Amino acid sequence: MAAPISEKMGITTPKDSIDRLPEDPEKVENTETTTDEEVIVPPVNNGETQQRWNESTTNLFRFFSTIYAFILMGMTDGAIGALLPYIERYYSISYTVVSLVFLSPFIGYLLAALLNNLIHHYFGQVGIAVLGPLCRLVGILPLVFHPPYPALPVVLLFTGFGNGIEDSAWNAWVGNMHNANELLGFLHGAYGLGATIGPLIATAMVTKGNLDWWYFYYVMLGLDAVALVLLTGAFWRATAKVYREQFLDATGGKRTTTRTVLKNPITWLLALFLLGYVGAEVSLGGWIVTFMLKVRHVEEFWAGLSVTFFWLGLTVGRVVLGFVTGKMGEKLAISIYLLLSVAMQILYWLVPNFAASVTFATFLGFFLGPLFPAAIVAATKLLPSDYHVSAIGFAAAFGGGGAALFPFAVGAIAQSKGVEVLQPFCLAMLIFILLMWWMLPGGHSRGGLERARENGEKVGDGFRRVGRRVLARSKGAEA
């Protein structure tokens, strides 16, 4: 018996995201006259038909293939920080110039944010499965030939685009499954695992194997070639035709434009939250080694090991706290994790001891771990179901740009002020994303996000409620 189309596509929506908002004037009824900016949206399903990661061999294959893809994405992002001092030394360049290896992928992530839905529409999920690894291969291949430095930022545009479209697509797919908090915890834990072993392998190759920095990318070439085969095989039947047929059957031809999704303030709030979060995470991961060498004055191997412990803490946090977050409620849990992260960041900054620094960095990674998965779950609970693929895809890819933008900013400032600027910079970013999180609709009790959608709460309502209470109490005190 042939598998239903919904099983082939793998995009469903949570039960609490079924109720649709009033019809948007941007909706277009006639599919033949829609423009390229308009994107297919996933069908509306009830909670009983939510996909499970293990409901079929197809889903099992696809889920574990995305896990492997996230491991490679983590290795790519994590290793660059460990190799940064050696790239700087090899090319004899400044902090600002070497930081361009962080900035250039931002353009790739931005393009991924804008094109994610069009790729789904014209090529389906199999298009993502092919383009993601292929773009990473195009970006990595020149690195093994250690070309002149100006070529590095250019080729890394491709890795940014490949990571961006996979990041957005697989987040949207897994984020709409049953037990999304836990599954996204494993998915992003895989990224953390890659970011843990990537620097470890790279550091060992350079410091213990006496190899030049570019030899690490021979390893990545082989691993990404495997990813191309795995993902293409896993999503081979998830074509554009399947994607469009599922949509037309479920919605009668209605489509939601990208412009409409971007007019919703929640989309931008989550995108800014992820931009700041990923920026803080990768700034720490990218500059810890240099910070330990220049400020804590430790040996190269131990400096490389410190970033491994940071990513290890992040990996464990994503997996372990993923089971806690859903039980506490996303709004409360992430608020607690962020406050603890701020405390760890301050201690990491102010305690000038190597062992203490590694300990605080590890716990900082642990509490930062579940933030990205929780933001994806929040999107599925606060936004209409037909916004999910577009909004999550945009927020994830736009947020991924933080991995390029903010580490570059740290490097540019460090050129004149020293790498010590890493700590106050990351502290400011953590406070910023905490404020962004508190601006989301919904209270801090469990189920607050769901009730916020049911009650039609708006962005910043929590701050307004607190302001009214403070004002009322001050008036009462005066009386």
Question: Where do the language-model regions lie?
Answer:
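Extracytoplasmic gate region of multi-pass secondary transporters
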Residues: 80-81, 264-316
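Conserved MFS/SLC helix-loop-helix module at the cytosolic interface between two early adjacent transmembrane helices
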Residues: 111-150
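Helix-loop-helix hairpin linking two adjacent transmembrane segments in secondary transporters
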Residues: 180, 186-242
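C-terminal transmembrane helical hairpin of 12-TM major facilitator-type secondary transporters
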Residues: 328-375
